[in-house]
């Protein structure tokens, strides 16, 4: 007997139930209205906030800026008037920010250390770094990691 991962079985079962009409259609669910309150300019026309995370304790958004290789920090304690309050330069740790996440009292960014290619032009995996900093942008540590 062929074994399927649990997630595959769940998806197949849910699909079958939807087809059979046994699950409520999304149209029957309560609707959610989203209203824009404000927007934040992420740069001077160069770079953009590709990946962002929110830290509730500091009321700040931390966003990757791949062009500048930084994590930009935005204070949204006054939601109607957000402002950029700083950035963390990641060039000392690597050359390509790939992710950011916030939790407790720290923020973690992941960076590639170098872009390496084989003789045939195929990208090769190199060790990367994680950069741990506080919500004010002060770097606390930067241990090596594998497979970034």
What is the predicted function of each stretch?
Residues 28-148:
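Mobile, glycine-rich extracellular loop/lid and propeptide segments
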Residues 1-26:
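Gram-negative bacterial Sec-dependent N-terminal signal peptides
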């Amino acid at each position: 007997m062929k074994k399927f991962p649990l997630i595959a079985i769940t998806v197949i079962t849910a699909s079958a139930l939807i087809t059979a009409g046994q699950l409520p259609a999304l149209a029957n669910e309560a609707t959610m209205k989203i209203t824009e309150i404000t927007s934040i300019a992420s740069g001077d026309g160069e770079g953009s906030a590709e990946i962002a995370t929110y830290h509730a304790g500091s009321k700040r958004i931390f966003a990757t800026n791949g062009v500048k290789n930084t994590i930009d920090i935005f204070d949204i304690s006054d939601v109607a008037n957000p402002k950029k309050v700083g950035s963390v330069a990641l060039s000392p740790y690597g050359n390509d920010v790939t992710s950011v996440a916030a939790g407790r009292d720290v923020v973690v960014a992941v960076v590639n250390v170098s872009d390496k290619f084989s003789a045939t032009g195929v990208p090769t995996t190199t060790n990367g770094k994680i950069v741990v900093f506080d919500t004010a942008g002060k770097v606390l540590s930067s241990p090596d990691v594998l497979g970034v």
